[in-house]
Amino acid sequence: MAVGEPAEEMYRILELSHPLLPEKKPRYLMGVGTPENILNAIERGIDMFDCVIPTREGRNGRVYTRQGKMNLRSAKYSADFSSIDEGFDNDVCRNYSRAYLRHLLNVGELLGLKLCTLQNISFFMWLTATARAEIQKGSFMEWKQDFLERFNYNDNT
């Protein structure tokens, strides 16, 4: 249902089908991978997702951060020795700079593709874990709105 249809149509179908699904069973949506689509689907009762976006984007030098997307092949990162996502606790952000990752990508070193993919997988794990925590606190809708405003504003691809 999620592959090829406009997002608004997908959301409409989710809203229609949600009441028809068993309450105690997990709800899976295939092929949904943008942060916006994932959070909007969670809002509509979806529990699980899978998509190629984290790996495909990583193989193309694009990484997801809590502030937005980055295209690390861009020349603007050639002398940027800061972390991809300051304060994000994963191996990529702790150990590699934007400039170093850009260098790896531009010389065709496979490590660069792997590190970008690891960053993206870490980001999406953080996104869903944080969404779950915000649901438990009763503040999901406010957090989602704040996150998406910040994230979509900073799409640096």
Q: What role is predicted for each listed range?
A:
Residues 1-84:
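Glycine-rich phosphate/ribose-binding loops and adjacent secondary-structure elements
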Residues 87-157:
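C-terminal extensions of enzymes
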